[in-house]
């Protein structure tokens, strides 16, 4: 029986300003995968945000790391099995050939709003 990779994506709400609030909704909230699987995590914005979407990975007890910028650009040093797609309101983080070391929380965030 193969080992499983447990991934947790979570909803992160961020208010961009008082004139235009953007809500980001991720799905699924939790998933299990077997090493070698392909995994997709969806992030939907409540309004058009062009390509202003970043993805982050956070392992338990560690700081979040930046993995995808502006929806599709892989951050240097991140393995190429990670990729991002989307524009406007619908975005996807894809992990191809997932590995056990990829077990983590994943979250999307409109890039103009990272503290």
From Swiss-Prot:
Report the GO molecular function annotations.
Answer: antigen binding
- Which residues does the annotated region (Complementarity-determining-1) include? 44-54
Instruction: Show the segment(s) annotated as Complementarity-determining-3.
Output: 109-115
Residues with the modification Phosphoserine, per the entry, are 42
Framework-3: annotated span: 77-108
**Which keywords accompany this UniProt record?**
Adaptive immunity, Cell membrane, Disulfide bond, Glycoprotein, Immunity, Immunoglobulin, Immunoglobulin domain, Membrane, Phosphoprotein, Secreted, Signal
Which Cys-Cys disulfides exist here? 43-108
The domain of life is Eukaryota
Which N-terminal stretch is annotated as signal sequence?
A: 1-20
- Complementarity-determining-2: annotated segments: 70-76
Which Gene Ontology terms of cellular component type are present? extracellular region; immunoglobulin complex; plasma membrane
Report the protein name in the record. Answer: Immunoglobulin kappa variable 5-2
Please give the organism. Homo sapiens
What gene codes for this chain? IGKV5-2
């Amino acid at each position: 029986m193969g080992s499983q990779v447990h991934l947790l994506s979570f909803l992160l709400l961020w208010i961009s300003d008082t004139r235009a609030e953007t809500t980001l909704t991720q799905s699924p909230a939790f998933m299990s995968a077997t090493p070698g699987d392909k995994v997709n995590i969806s992030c939907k914005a409540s309004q058009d945000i062009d390509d202003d979407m970043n993805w982050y990975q956070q392992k338990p007890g560690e700081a979040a790391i930046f993995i995808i910028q502006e929806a599709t650009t892989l951050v240097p040093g991140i393995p190429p099995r990670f990729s991002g797609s989307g524009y406007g309101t619908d975005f996807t983080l894809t992990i191809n050939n997932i590995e056990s070391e990829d077990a983590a929380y994943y979250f999307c965030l409109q890039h103009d709003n990272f503290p």
